[in-house]
Amino acid sequence: MSTDQFGLSDGDYVPDPDRDTALLLDGFYDHLAREHGDLVAAMRARHEELEAANRHLIVDEPARHNLRMTLALVAAYELLLPGLGRPATIEAVRVAFVEPLGEATRQGTLAMLDAAPDPFLALVAVSKSREEHAFGKGFVFERPVDDERRYHVDVRRCFYHDVLAANGAPELTPVMCAFDANWIEAIEPDRHGFAFERRTTIGLGGSHCPFHFTRNQD
C-alpha cells in the first residue's frame, strides 16, 4: 500500500476533498479510540449534531468538507474536556488530528519535490490547486507577490477559525495550523532551491496567515 495517500507525488495533484476528509477523520477517530474508546461513539454522535446545526455556514462544496472536518475537533473537544481539562484536551485533539497522516504527508511531499524538475513551481502549483479546490470561498486569499521567484499568499479569512469561533472553540484553531507542519517539514531549502516561511497565523493571534514561498538567492 502506498504511503502517499494524498497522491502528492503523482505530479498532477488535484485535491479530492471527499477522500482527503475521510482519510483525516478515519485517522482522527482511530487515534482517539486508543485511549478514549469509550467516548468515540458519543463523539461521532455529537459530530453529526454539530454538522446539522452548522449547515448554514456552508458556502460551497469545499466548505461542506471543511465544516465536517473542523467540527470533528469540536465534538472530541467537548467530550474530552470534562475529564482532561483544557490544556490536555487541546493536546489530545492536536495529536489525533496531526499525527496519523503526518509521516505520509511528509513523505508524499518530499517525493513530489525530489521528482519535480522545478520543486518551487511544483509546490506552488499544489498550493494554488488547494486554494481553489480544497479551501474555496470560505477562505479569503490575497497574493501580494506571484512571480518566477516568489509566491506569497496571505490568508485574510480562515473558514476553520470562523467555524471554531462560532462553536465556542477558537482555541482549537492552532490545531488546524499545526497540520501544515507535516508538509512544511519536507521542504529542504538547500536541496529543493526554495524556502517557505509562515511567521504567524490567525489562530496564533495574527491578522492573517502568510504562506510565503521564495526561491533561494543565486
What annotation goes with each model-predicted range?
Residues 35-39, 86-87, 170, 190:
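Short coil/loop linkers at secondary-structure junctions
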Residues 142-167, 172-175, 181-184, 191-218:
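Short terminal or interdomain "cap/linker" segment that borders an active site or interface and mediates
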Residues 1-29, 190, 194-202, 206-218:
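Activation/maturation switch segments at domain boundaries
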Residues 133-137, 187-194:
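Short secondary-structure junctions
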Residues 2-80:
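N-terminal, charged low-complexity regulatory/assembly segments
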